[in-house]
């Protein structure tokens, strides 16, 4: 914004969390508006109405405000951890989230501000797990099975053939909607991306099983 104010040829792009994005509609209307918000992991930038002074500054110096989802933000935090070895809070990672999501793309060199590292360790743990799931590298499956010997071994064999790595298994005979002769197999599985994840599910389905992905 300072470079833009100095008259340099700079395009400034703001980013908000999709669940609490007051600026796009406010800028379109030419005045601060109050919008309905829903919870977001980027609570540091969650505002229902822009302040009058920030709105005036952003209206003058920012070219565009784009939005990103919480899934986008989780993927950005995970990417920063893995590639840059940086711990960045959700509100501070929205710029990277926008680039990874293809929002507000610039035609030349692009700089992103990482504006904070204040993230609770437990939230970081959840965000990393969510980021892995959102990028297709981790999933939890529930599979109803006939209660007879060999079923667990068969599922394990199929997952091995598909190249998936099982990291946790829960086998239970108790669950809503289960028949007396059924069990539920729940597996936490590492995969290599969305295509591999879809392939793993397809291999199980082609073998006659009915896997269900358990969302976070």
Where are these regions (language model features)?
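Catalytic cores of large soluble enzymes that bind and process phosphate-bearing ligands
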Residues: 15, 46, 50, 65-72, ...
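Beta-strand->loop->alpha-helix junctions that form or flank phosphate-binding loops
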Residues: 14-16, 67-69, 88-89, 167-174, ...
């Amino acid at each position: 914004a300072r470079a833009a104010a100095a008259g340099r040829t700079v395009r400034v792009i703001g980013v908000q969390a999709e669940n609490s994005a007051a600026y796009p509609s406010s800028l379109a209307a030419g005045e601060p508006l109050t919008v309905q918000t829903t919870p977001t992991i980027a609570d540091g930038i969650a505002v229902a109405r822009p302040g009058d002074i920030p709105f005036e500054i952003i209206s003058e110096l920012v070219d565009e405000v784009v939005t990103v989802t919480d899934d986008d933000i989780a993927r950005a935090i995970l990417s920063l951890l893995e590639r840059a070895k940086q711990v960045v809070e959700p509100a501070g990672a929205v710029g990277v989230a926008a680039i990874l999501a293809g929002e507000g793309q610039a035609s030349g060199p692009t700089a992103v501000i990482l504006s904070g590292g204040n993230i609770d360790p437990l939230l970081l743990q959840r965000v990393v797990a969510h980021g892995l799931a959102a990028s297709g590298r981790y999933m939890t499956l529930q599979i109803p099975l006939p209660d007879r010997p060999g079923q667990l071994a068969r599922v394990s064999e199929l997952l091995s053939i598909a190249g998936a790595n099982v990291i946790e298994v829960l086998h239970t005979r108790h669950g809503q909607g289960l028949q007396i002769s059924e069990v539920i197999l729940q597996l936490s599985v590492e995969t290599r991306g969305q295509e591999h994840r879809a392939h793993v599910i397809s291999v199980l389905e082609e073998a006659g099983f009915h896997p269900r992905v358990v969302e976070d």
